[in-house]
């Protein structure tokens, strides 16, 4: 059943164009089951019994050395600069491990960077507002990672920010939480010229520039005031799933 389960999920992941590491957790189970099957089949053979005293220490040493070699791929034990040298030396460097190209680091590593800087700018901007504006402001993020970072650090550090809103995935379902789209702190990658078509006042309050973050997480953070009557808010238009 283990082998059949793997085959079924492999086909499903292939058809759905899933990310390559989604099946990774099942491989240790397959290796363990395969090892038992091989041992039952070959352990009693005279040649295997005679040479196992040498074979097992060699195998164990190979497993330990290989495990140490690939350990940085499974645990964040290296600093970013050391990681880049490591992957370059082993020819493992790839700038596209998910749906978009990354910079120096693959996305699963790059996505660990930049969130504190982003939230610090948002919190500073929020605290610069009057109490009345703080009560009504929207904090809008372009994707669930940005919105999730705001909500996470808001709770952890007691920043007293309103909930982040976003049109991305489940955040769209949670709506706008009653905030006023006439005043927005926006973490988006749109240009000031494009935003000015929707808002009368567009102020850059900070720049996201953490070196090792994903390229699309570099950009401006805005304070927007005065939604133009020619561009009314339609929450349904903000919905995007990927």
Spans of model-derived segments:
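Aromatic/acidic, Gly/Pro-rich catalytic loop(s) in extracytoplasmic/lumenal soluble domains
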Residues: 117, 121, 130, 157-242
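Signature aromatic-anchored transmembrane alpha helix within multi-pass, membrane-resident enzymes
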Residues: 41-86
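Membrane-interface helix-loop-helix junctions at transmembrane boundaries of multi-pass membrane enzymes
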Residues: 1-4
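Hydrophobic/aromatic-rich transmembrane helices and adjacent perimembrane loops
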Residues: 7-49, 54-55
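Short phosphate-engaging motifs
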Residues: 21, 146, 191
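Short periplasmic/luminal acceptor-recognition loop of GT-C membrane glycosyltransferases, typified by
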Residues: 71-76, 85-171
